[in-house]
């Protein structure tokens, strides 16, 4: 097999070395010419795999190490008989850790009690569903909007988007980017909906940039709208809007799901799909390539405040403010410089583990055990 992989996909050799020749390119450089002699294509979300790129090529399998598939022309894949796989849920836990870090930063700035907020989660798939589990596990009030899932689960606890936007203090977006169809999500939060948000609302977008109308959001924030905003995704990536970023409490370069586990899990999942497509046995597993966690065990004082414990456990693993600082330093120079910096921050992102690898002792206090279990950390 002739394999072409995005150079930023990790451990490709570990999984695919015995499957043929492997060539690597920057994801944004993968085009029609690059696919002239390729059987297997491995990409991330930065590569648009379209009819124009694939027509006439020998590509027979496409794997994307991402949850989303809006960069894949699935209609053409079906027409051309091209097998494909995404990596559903691969980085979901990393995104949840990111959102928790954003909420802690917002609460610190606002002097708010996270337990007293009402949370609205838009999109309850792999990421949003896990976030809902964590928030409800903490005992917090959560509203969920997911029309496609509601259609499949008519007895589920879902609300309309209008009700969620009207009642939630915190809105976290986790939808795919659908430009058409029954449930389009491009500019789901458009100017009228953004303008109607309650004063003091917190907004987190770690899904796709175009789910929020970035220009409308910037105009509102420049006009003094009382919102706290955390954006990890941007319209026109890798060209993020510096003026919009300046008005965000947290601004990062599409790294919410960049945990080490998430990255390696994504490669493992497309390898599994590739093996199934070829009808061959898997010879490598995720556990073969995943380093043992370096997170230290933590001992919580049984008398500590559960809210303090929550913040301490989350920040012991990840605090998005460090990524925010690095991103803001990159938002200088001309457009080409900023685009290159956006990709460089993602390419050279430091290893980050997930909260699920944290081992925590609580001295037997039930309230602290609830926090640990809700976060998905390990009780010892």
Curated annotation (Swiss-Prot):
GO terms for cellular component: cytosol. Its main location: cytoplasm. It catalyses: 4-phospho-D-erythronate + NAD(+) = (R)-3-hydroxy-2-oxo-4-phosphooxybutanoate + NADH + H(+). InterPro entries: D-isomer_2_OHA_DH_cat_dom (IPR006139), D-isomer_DH_CS (IPR029753), D-isomer_DH_NAD-bd (IPR006140), Erythronate-4-P_DHase (IPR020921), Erythronate-4-P_DHase_dimer (IPR024531), NAD(P)-bd_dom_sf (IPR036291), PdxB_dimer_sf (IPR038251). Its EC number is 1.1.1.290. Catalyzes the oxidation of erythronate-4-phosphate to 3-hydroxy-2-oxo-4-phosphonooxybutanoate. This is Erythronate-4-phosphate dehydrogenase. The gene is pdxB.
